[in-house]
Amino acid sequence: MIKIIKEAQVRSEEDNRNLRETVAGIIGEIRGRGDAALKEYNEKFDGCTRESLRVSREEIDAAYKELGEQELADLKAAHHNIEAFANAQRQTVKPLDNFSPEPGVFLGHRIIPVESCCCYVPGGNYPLYSTALMLATPAKAAGVKRITACSPVVRGTGHINARTLVAMDLAGVDEIYALGGAQAIAAFSYGTESIKPVDIIVGPGNRFVTEAKRQCYGQVGIDFVAGPSEVLVIADGKASAKVVAADLLAQSEHDVNAKGILLTTDEAFGKSVIEAVEEELKILDTAKIARQSWDTFGEIGVVDSLDEAVQYANEYAPEHLELNVEDPDALIPKLVNYGSLFIGQNTAEVFGDYASGTNHTLPTLRAARYTGGVWVGTFLKTCTHQSMTPEASARIAPLVARMAHGEGLSGHAAAADERK
């Protein structure tokens, strides 16, 4: 049984009716008035009065000049790892042809990239330019022909953050648009005068973006509906309290709704992490947000065994899961529900956020029970095909006709009988 030594508040069930109605109204405006509505929302929410929503090549080139040599080198290094892993993953997704379950019946599948995608890169509290690399790079590796991206402008400037623009360009984005929010999701779902709709939209955003993705799903594909960021750390008493505290606060600083959880087999260690968190908050630049998040949703529990921690992790299905224990390899086979796994004290969760090569766009709110994060396969379709010899067609037709009659579908049976 887990003993809680630092308790989180229960996340209240938010009344989403107003949110749903607001987002539905925005979507309706974009569908009805197109670019005119987009520009109005751009000005209302971001103070942006730019005439052209599409970012020009000149703007992108100017963004490169704003970056220092080290900043550009860092972006290129991170992109290298993300691209290398995406390309390696692509090689694991193979076509299948001429599989024959019985004589004369030939089955297979093709791996086909979607034609177009939109990569939504958040602005908000922090310009998450790393997200541009995480979204567009696997799309490029998948072979998507038209990769678009959008991000809100830096308020009052009319321009997207320079690092974000450069990251989009490095990752191979074909079209960049200066807009965000629910209105951006609607535009790329239904299209406007200046924006052609896409096949799939990927990327995180605020609750308005998330609700818009939910409402537009079906008209457009999405990666998943994401909630606040979360990390679960499993640690024994031999871990570093300072390291664990830093990892918990790295998650907490995302926003006031982020959640950091520690499960440990050592109560004294858990208490030392609480102390280390307090010390770190004294010097953290983002302490205001991190403090509110940690006080509200941070949690530390003491487990009787690491197996109990594993059981909890599988039920919770965290976005990020850290194994900060002496023998992490013993736990890995037992873990089945997580967005991304970080093995051992050397492997900080923030490394995956930026540059190790795995993707940081991951499922939250227990969605890791049924899906993984964004990867090259997000942009690929597995499409089956089949062919038959005349002999096989005649042989299988009576079977199909009998089954069709059993379901009361005489038209199906007739179509099968024509092949006898």
Ranges and model annotations:
Residues 4-7, 175-180, 300-305:
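Short acidic-hydrophobic, aromatic-tinged amphipathic segments that line or gate anion-handling sites
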Residues 134-145, 169-171, 189-196, 213, ...:
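Alpha-helix C-terminal capping segments
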Residues 1-115:
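N-terminal Rossmann-like NAD(P)+-binding subdomain of aldehyde/semialdehyde dehydrogenases
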Residues 314-420:
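C-terminal core of ALDH-fold dehydrogenases
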Residues 254, 262-338:
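A glycine- and small/hydrophobic-rich beta-loop-beta segment
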Residues 172-259:
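Conserved NAD(P)+-binding/catalytic subdomain of aldehyde/semialdehyde dehydrogenases
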Residues 96-166:
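Conserved small-residue-rich beta-alpha loop and adjacent elements
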